[in-house]
């Protein structure tokens, strides 16, 4: 209960600091960078600590440590993919597409806050294992779909940039 609450409170502050800086006009590239770096360390750290705790306190459930390691690996890669793709899309002058309420609801199991609250069940053994494994499976499925979609989107940006370069070269030749 204490771990779940502490993680949730930490996540709440992590979410709030960016909102407060935007509302007050105090946001900066440095602040955004620090926030992303902290997130990049926090995300896999939760799972690696879970793997270590499983091996220390529940070694008979070693398979859950493997789930935790895979979960950490996937969330780390997903985070990097998301950050880079957003930067590339923004740099290309394209608008970011966000899903609606249904998408937010469907992706709720991938929300770090849900993960944090799942640790409230740690002391109950099996319910935690089932929920944590479910959250990991959803993260793997979401990451697979998201990575494929992002790759297609970025390939389309590359194709559009190549086409624009060809057209610019043709216009340059016709002027010469």
Model-identified regions with their sequence ranges:
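Internal amphipathic alpha-helical segments of the cytochrome P450 catalytic fold
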Residues: 17-18, 31, 128, 141
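A feature for the membrane-embedded catalytic helix bundles of lipid/isoprenoid biosynthetic enzymes
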Residues: 36-166, 170-176
């Amino acid at each position: 209960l204490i771990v779940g609450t502490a993680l949730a409170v930490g996540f709440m502050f992590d979410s709030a600091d960016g909102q407060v800086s935007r509302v007050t006009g105090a946001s900066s590239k440095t602040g955004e960078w620090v926030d992303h770096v902290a997130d990049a360390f926090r995300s896999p750290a939760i799972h690696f600590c879970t793997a270590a705790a499983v091996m220390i306190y529940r070694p008979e459930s070693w398979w859950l440590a493997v789930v935790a390691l895979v979960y950490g690996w996937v969330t780390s890669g997903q985070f990097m993919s998301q950050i880079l793709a957003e930067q590339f899309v923004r740099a290309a002058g394209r608008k970011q597409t966000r899903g609606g309420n249904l998408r937010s609801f469907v992706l709720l199991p991938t929300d770090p806050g849900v993960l944090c609250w799942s640790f409230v069940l740690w002391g109950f053994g099996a319910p935690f294992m089932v929920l944590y494994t479910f959250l990991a499976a959803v993260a793997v499925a979401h990451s697979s779909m998201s990575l494929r979609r992002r790759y297609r989107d970025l390939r389309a940006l590359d194709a559009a940039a190549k086409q624009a370069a060809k057209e610019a070269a043709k216009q340059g030749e016709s002027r010469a």
